[in-house]
Amino acid sequence: MRVFFTGGSGKAGRYAIQELQAAGHTVVNIDQVPCGLPDTPELLIDLTDPGQVMGAMTQWADFDEMEDAPRAYDAVVHFAAVPRVMIGDDGSCFRANVASTYNVIEAAYKLGVPKVIFASSETTYGVCFAQGEVKPAYVPVDEDHPTVPHDSYAMSKVCNEATARSFQARAAQAGRAMDIYGLRINNVIEPHEYVQNFPAFVADPALRRRNIFAYIDARDLGQMVNCCLATDGLGYEVFNVANEDSSVGMPSVEVAETFYAGVPVKGDLGGHTTFYAIDKAKKMVGFAPEHGWRDLV
């Protein structure tokens, strides 16, 4: 597949691009700064400008392409975003994330791109950046859990899910096959961060409360994107993306007793089972995370 990948210069994007390339996909990185990965054409644009998005999606991306007309994209992967609150002002975070996502999905729709995969977030569940302590409505948290966040970043992601759902419905109404999958990505961890950060999480599990005690290896996130590229015909779907185990040393039953007293338990919490359910992704697209921290720390 030829993939229009936004945000490939970021923490998650760099790993995802490499996983896609290893699977044989041709990836063009769209960002504001270069990623510097070998054999990766790049276009540096402002995704909040719809004209620039449409232009980038319809032009040549590399000198090797110039013997023919610009090639269409087979898929769009949209990871670009202001990555959290408290980087700039809240309004700018919300505006940039909502506008860029609308522009990317609209361009994909108008150009007939059959698949869009976009980064949503664990924050949509309203725990991560909540004002004060907010516990999940139940655990493990699955995709049916309410999404009523307090912060501008998570609000932008909720809006982006609505945008995606609406464009997919519009395509279906027009009789067009267009799949749009949203990834509610948990805290992304690079390989070097296991030794760097996880001893502190083992010593003080409370540090992971706002992340619902979960995490996702950056390489496994790339695998999830590959799984979504390989799975057609689902229409609009959202998927939790995390590793199968928790990010703390304490057994999950103990974590629930300590931090989630009174919270209904709706699934198995044996061993170090994640509190961020990925059953849907495993069943519907074949997601099977391979990397974890327990053999390294």
Locations of the language-model features?
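Alpha-helical substrate-binding/gating segment
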Residues: 188-206, 211-238
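Catalytic helix-loop patch of NAD(P)-dependent Rossmann-fold dehydrogenases
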Residues: 95, 130-176
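C-terminal substrate-binding subdomain of Rossmann-fold SDR/epimerase-dehydratase oxidoreductases
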Residues: 219-297
